[in-house]
């Protein structure tokens, strides 16, 4: 089950999907799995079992990790890498996956990541959300 449309985007309301567990054991297992997947996303940017985004996972190789949700359109990756090149950041590891009209790109970079990088990446026409971990 999915949250009611009128609750999406309401300040202070955090909508989560129905887990569908039918026994105490499965409820616990589903809750633990969901918590682990959410923790992995928050700490590492990895996405597992998302309804809206593709599954994307890569091991951390050090440095900073940049996670970008963007429209799946030509030129999106070159815009991202162009900004990173201009900032003198080296891409150590990168993965990009799309699902229909949305894509998710994770990049592990080395170099001096300054505070303005999030704003620069957010300014890309195709960018939806940018996080630097």
Regions found by a protein language model. Name each.
Residues 1-60, 104:
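Rossmann-like dinucleotide-binding domain for NAD(H)/NADP(H)
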């Amino acid at each position: 089950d999915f949250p009611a449309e009128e609750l999406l985007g309401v300040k202070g309301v955090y909508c989560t999907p129905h887990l569908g567990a039918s026994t105490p054991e499965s409820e616990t297992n589903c809750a633990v799995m969901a918590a682990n997947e959410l923790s992995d996303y928050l700490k590492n940017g990895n996405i597992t079992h998302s309804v809206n985004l593709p599954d994307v996972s890569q091991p951390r190789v050090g440095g900073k990790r940049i996670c970008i949700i963007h429209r799946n359109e030509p030129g999106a990756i070159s815009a991202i890498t162009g900004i990173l090149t201009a900032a003198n950041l080296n891409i150590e590891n990168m993965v990009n996956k799309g699902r229909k009209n949305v894509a998710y790109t994770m990049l592990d970079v080395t170099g001096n990541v300054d505070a303005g990088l999030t704003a620069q990446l957010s300014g890309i026409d195709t960018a939806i959300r940018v996080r630097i971990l």
